[in-house]
Amino acid sequence: MTVQPFSPDSDLTLDEAMDELVSAEDFLEFFGVPFDQTVVHVNRLHIMQRYHDYLTKAGDLDEHDDQARYAVVPAAARAYLDFVESDALTEKVFKVFRMHEPQKTFVSIDQLLS
């Protein structure tokens, strides 16, 4: 897929501009972030979740606001670079990586019989 690069000066909203993006590679190309295909292949879900996390931490970004339009590019680059410099196990983007031990639930016989 050929991706049109992101332009903060576009008349489209961010949602409209990103409507056709379907992969992590599309997002990185859209935001002009150079990437190593191997890193993206192994970490695509982690990169996209981290990007989402960074946008969430940035607060309520009005997609028509010029500042918001400039804030999304560094978030995409930072999300990708997190996994160039580290790995999924270290970054712990998803809850399953943050769990130290298996979750155990004890149900007594009395609870079962009541």
Swiss-Prot record:
Keywords: Nitrogen fixation. Homotrimer; associates with NifD. It comes from Azotobacter chroococcum mcd 1. Disulfide bonds: none annotated. GO terms for biological process: nitrogen fixation. Belongs to the NifW family. It comes from the Bacteria. This is Nitrogenase-stabilizing/protective protein NifW. It holds the Pfam family NifW. May protect the nitrogenase Fe-Mo protein from oxidative damage.
